[in-house]
Amino acid sequence: MARFDLSQYATVEERLKTFWADEKNSDARIITLNHSKDSALWIIETRIYLTAGDQATDLPKTTGWASEANSDAFALERCETSSIGRALANYIYSGSKRPSREEMEKVARMDWLERAGSLGTIEELRDLYAQAKANNASQEILEGLKLYA
């Protein structure tokens, strides 16, 4: 179970708003590239260019990479969002904590699923599911736990 307060982490949306509000980024571009090699794992690279000239010469100010298991219909979107957030953090938009809220949500999600992978019986999985539900785990996590049964 996660031992951190998600409200202490900026969302990628908040970082993007700060980025675009900065006048020096008025000509910037945020480009995402799919580097996935198979259907099991999404791998996304984000490149931030501050000017058209930087993009034309392929000189990004910064990059960010993220990966996400292709576990549901929204895995690609989460991966792209995380990649953008990492690129912004690698530049100057990390806020008070470097990881984005979305990245920390992934950690929280992984805690339950990782724990499920180490259990050996259906009864243990049922107990874990009940704990996750009692702790307000997302529907996505609960559905992921069901896959272990």
Summary of predicted features, one role per range:
Residues C79, L128-Y129:
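Short, polar loop/linker segments at the starts of domains and inter-domain junctions
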